[in-house]
Amino acid sequence: DLSPTQTGTATGAGVGAGLGGLIGAVTGDGGGKRTATGAAIGAALGGAAGYFWSDRMQKQKAQMEAATQGTGVQVTQTPDNRLKLEIPSDISFDTGRADIKPNFRSILDQFARTLTENPSTTINIIGHTDNTGTDAMNDKLSLQRAESTRNYLSARGVNSARVNIAGHGEREPIAVNDTAANRAKNRRVEIFVAESKIKILNQVEAR
């Protein structure tokens, strides 16, 4: 199995090769030779960027693991090298509401600090509900929760232009909605953080 760093390097190399090939094809006069050269350069840049990105994300992951220890928040690294925070409903929002609970604020405070230290990342916040209520109500509520989370981060210095939000309602359960405990699992907020590959490629190329 690949380590997180090796996975990041491999992912970055693949993206870099694709970008390099595209750049060579669009901007060059040398046909296939130019494309191959662009792909080779892109692969080198992509490999460096993937390693660099993985290292930065690993640091942020460690910070958030320490900040959320014992809270029920799950901090993981996704297969595509994004940082994922899964926040359960018992610490984030009361039933049927989009107001951030006090326990969630302290987590978001630390999270905002890690985001301002790494300004090249982008953030996706997705709200989820259980199957109680109508689709229209759940879609609206899940979006409002994502929006509340974004606004809280923005008030603590995170540029809102970096943050995308969505409400998926009850459509992506992680447990069968057959018990109160399982419904509570489905009421959650997921936050994904990703390093911008384009920005990192530009940083490496500038060196």
Regions found by a protein language model. Give the residues of each.
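Short, low-complexity, glycine-enriched hydrophobic/amphipathic alpha-helices that associate
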Residues: 1-61
